Amino acid sequence: MKNPFEAMKQLKKLQEKMAKIEEELEQTLVEGTAGGGVVKIVMTAKEEVKEVKIDPEVVNKDEVDILEDLIAAALRDALTKAKEKSAEKMGSLTDGLPLPPGLF
């Protein structure tokens, strides 16, 4: 069996990497768009919405339902991108560790 102190050192390194990745995810911005850029949502890779931008040209009180659909689509797009960034960064966390496949 491996030296328990070595395992503790690896765990500490893993925790340090995790903290660094969490910080990077908080700073990484992604942008989701819909309607050809008419609606934009900017969020962190930790899925915190920072901005919602709507082109004033498309604001029409008679077509609020279309605008609502565009906002929802932009949010879904931004969430997908945030999750992809998060998975990408988290994948690098376990590189070189003897873990079973699919654990993270």
Swiss-Prot record:
<protein>
    <recommendedName>
        <fullName>Nucleoid-associated protein Dtur_0258</fullName>
    </recommendedName>
</protein>
<comment type="subunit">
    <text>Homodimer.</text>
</comment>
<dbReference type="GO" id="GO:0003677">
    <property type="term" value="F:DNA binding"/>
</dbReference>
<dbReference type="GO" id="GO:0043590">
    <property type="term" value="C:bacterial nucleoid"/>
</dbReference>
<feature type="region of interest" description="Disordered">
    <location>
        <begin position="84"/>
        <end position="104"/>
    </location>
</feature>
<dbReference type="GO" id="GO:0005829">
    <property type="term" value="C:cytosol"/>
</dbReference>
<dbReference type="InterPro" id="IPR004401">
    <property type="entry name" value="YbaB/EbfC"/>
</dbReference>
<dbReference type="InterPro" id="IPR036894">
    <property type="entry name" value="YbaB-like_sf"/>
</dbReference>
<comment type="function">
    <text>Binds to DNA and alters its conformation. May be involved in regulation of gene expression, nucleoid organization and DNA protection.</text>
</comment>
<dbReference type="Pfam" id="PF02575">
    <property type="entry name" value="YbaB_DNA_bd"/>
</dbReference>
<keyword id="KW-0238">DNA-binding</keyword>
<keyword id="KW-0963">Cytoplasm</keyword>
<comment type="similarity">
    <text>Belongs to the YbaB/EbfC family.</text>
</comment>
